[in-house]
């Protein structure tokens, strides 16, 4: 599923390609690209839920307003997000790439992934996808993109 998300993001979303394709056509295109239909449906569902969060169609998050508050991760979250990932999220909050709401959106979307293996590079891509889909986060998206891509050669770090 994560491979499908990456492919969609790189091929359509990130390149600002016109994505007014119906789901059946997109599914057929992805199947021809070699992806499993179940992974395709899971990825499309993941993106729909991200859009629902972004549009406020899900229940609002109740977050502490205290800037000194520390996020306590659940056991499942610590299994998916290792210390390096959690440290990176904290770093992004400290440099104001993420705020409380976008951090929670990222964690929610990470936990919704159907994958056993997840590392820092995967987290960076999820963060980029979330920031891309949240209005008003253009500067944060640009900062995150700079952290993700090497400016000189364009390769993913």
Curated annotation (Swiss-Prot):
Coiled-coil segments: none
InterPro entries registered for this protein in UniProt: Smg
Transmembrane annotation, as ranges: none
Pfam families named in the record: DUF494
Family indicated by similarity: Belongs to the Smg family.
HAMAP family to which the protein is assigned, alphabetical: Smg (MF_00598)
Protein name stated in the entry: Protein Smg
Source species: Pectobacterium carotovorum subsp. carotovorum (strain PC1)
